[in-house]
């Protein structure tokens, strides 16, 4: 069962400025925390479309929210197909869209999914379990140079080269099959003094591999642009990010769509295609309160940004 503590619950949903009869999208259903709070604010004409790649998350939510009938619609899909899937449902615009980019706790805590460095399990890390690429493929098939690049770019790991060398040497004799084996190699690649600070030594490499397996940054960038197009004027987009790479994409995308580009002087009117699409609701990200951080340690790196369609 999905026992998932939702991060920035009220701030994210209230930030959408809910219209009770509106149409909303939860791009990251997960344990259904945001969906539950959002559904409770809708009247009979309102509806929520919830996306998730995980079949278990979809089935749990269908049971949990069965009393809402046709007000609650699930879509088993990566949110990169947001626009296409909504159009298949006959929906061309919506009143609000939310993204919570954290891996849901049930996925992290289910050992066989291979997301966690706390459990020994097969190397998997796929959000969509029908997807072809796994963490096993990345760790055993990708070149030293590719591993260094993703560890550094996606994990911001200072010891990327040392860790990649350990992996390269080990797999010459035997495939790396489990998260436990990978954790040991990561530890060997990080100098002892550095292992004692900054949380679990495998955290950054596991993040990097997960991002690579699921193509998370490119997917998010595409989906955020689609969300901005799909939201009607006055509608909002709420985004919770959990690391600097995601936050940078969100911040840059919101900023680019909320500013007027440099135009030749003397234009009598600004053409529509150059007018800002968004108004920033949050100039700086909203962070979890001290109370929330005490109750849920996983919220510590969360940042919420909200923008409104002009």
UniProtKB/Swiss-Prot annotation:
Q: Which domain of life is it from?
A: Bacteria
- Cite the entry's keywords alphabetically: Cytoplasm, Methyltransferase, rRNA processing, S-adenosyl-L-methionine, Transferase
Record-annotated residues binding S-adenosyl-L-methionine?
32-34, 52, 79, 100, 107
Q: What molecular function terms (GO) are annotated for this protein?
A: rRNA (cytosine-N4-)-methyltransferase activity
Q: Does the record bear DNA repair in its keywords?
A: no
One GO CC term, this protein = cytoplasm
Q: What class of enzyme is it?
A: transferase
Q: Name one Pfam family in it.
A: Methyltransf_5
Q: What is its EC number?
A: 2.1.1.199
Could you tell me which InterPro entries the record lists for this protein? RsmH, SAM-dep_MeTrfase_MraW_recog, SAM-dependent_MTases_sf
Q: What catalytic activity does the UniProt entry give for this protein?
A: cytidine(1402) in 16S rRNA + S-adenosyl-L-methionine = N(4)-methylcytidine(1402) in 16S rRNA + S-adenosyl-L-homocysteine + H(+)
Biological process, per Gene Ontology: rRNA base methylation
Keyword rRNA processing, does the record have it? yes
- Localization per Swiss-Prot or TrEMBL: Cytoplasm
Family label = Belongs to the methyltransferase superfamily. RsmH family.
Functional note: Specifically methylates the N4 position of cytidine in position 1402 (C1402) of 16S rRNA.
Q: By its UniProt entry, which HAMAP family does this protein fall under?
A: 16SrRNA_methyltr_H (MF_01007)
Instruction: State the protein's name.
Output: Ribosomal RNA small subunit methyltransferase H
Q: Which organism is it from?
A: Bacillus cereus (strain AH187)
């Amino acid at each position: 069962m999905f026992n998932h503590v939702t991060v920035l619950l009220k701030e994210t949903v209230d930030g959408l400025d809910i219209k009770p009869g509106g149409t909303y999208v939860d791009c990251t259903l997960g344990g259904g925390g945001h969906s539950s709070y959002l559904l409770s604010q809708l009247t009979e004409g309102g509806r929520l479309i919830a996306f998730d790649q995980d079949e278990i998350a979809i089935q749990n939510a269908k049971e949990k929210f069965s009393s809402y009938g046709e007000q609650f619609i699930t879509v088993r899909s990566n949110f990169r197909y947001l626009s296409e899937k909504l159009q298949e449902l006959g929906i061309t615009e919506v009143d609000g869209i939310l993204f919570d980019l954290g891996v849901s706790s049930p996925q992290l805590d289910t050992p066989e999914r291979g997301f966690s460095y706390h459990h020994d399990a097969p190397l998997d890390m796929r959000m969509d379990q029908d997807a072809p690429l796994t963490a096993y493929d990345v760790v055993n098939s990708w070149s030293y140079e590719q591993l260094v690049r993703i560890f550094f770019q996606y994990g911001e790991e200072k010891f990327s080269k040392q860790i990649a060398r350990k992996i390269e040497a080990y797999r010459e004799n035997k495939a790396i099959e489990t998260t436990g084996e990978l954790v040991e190699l990561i530890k060997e690649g990080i100098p002892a003094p550095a292992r004692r600070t900054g949380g679990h030594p495998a955290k950054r490499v596991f993040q990097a591999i997960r991002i690579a397996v699921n193509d998370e940054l490119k997917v998010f960038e595409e989906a955020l642009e689609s969300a901005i197009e799909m939201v009607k004027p006055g509608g909002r987009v709420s985004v919770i990010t959990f690391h600097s790479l995601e936050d940078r994409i969100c911040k840059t995308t919101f900023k680019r769509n909320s500013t007027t580009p440099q135009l030749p002087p003397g234009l009598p009117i600004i053409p529509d295609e150059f007018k800002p699409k968004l108004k920033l609701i949050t100039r700086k990200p909203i962070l979890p309160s001290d109370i929330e951080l005490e109750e849920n340690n996983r919220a510590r790196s969360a940042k919420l940004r909200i923008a409104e369609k002009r």
